[in-house]
């Protein structure tokens, strides 16, 4: 999977907004100012940081060498996934969906209702 393909998938989510975090040289994808994906190159490899439950994060890290704790985010919840690694694209898409849903669940009910209408 390429960074471009991943960004296209993320931006298709209702309410998704893209911005650049210059200090980290990363593209942040948010829904209503809640981060759900951060895309950048790590060690010259395309990667995305995604939020999961601590249990899933630990399991993924144990099973896949291409999944690591995120450097600049809460390591219990955020994992960096290399896009050119062993994790299948379908699983990366699933993790994006889960991270997006966690972000949406943090929003006030009124904002969640508006997203459904988009």
Curated annotation (Swiss-Prot):
InterPro entries: YjbR (IPR007351), YjbR-like_sf (IPR038056). Gene3D superfamilies: 3.90.1150.30. Pfam families: YjbR. It comes from the Bacteria. PANTHER family: CYTOPLASMIC PROTEIN, CYTOPLASMIC PROTEIN-RELATED. This is Uncharacterized protein YjbR. The lineage of its organism: Bacteria, Pseudomonadati, Pseudomonadota, Gammaproteobacteria, Enterobacterales.
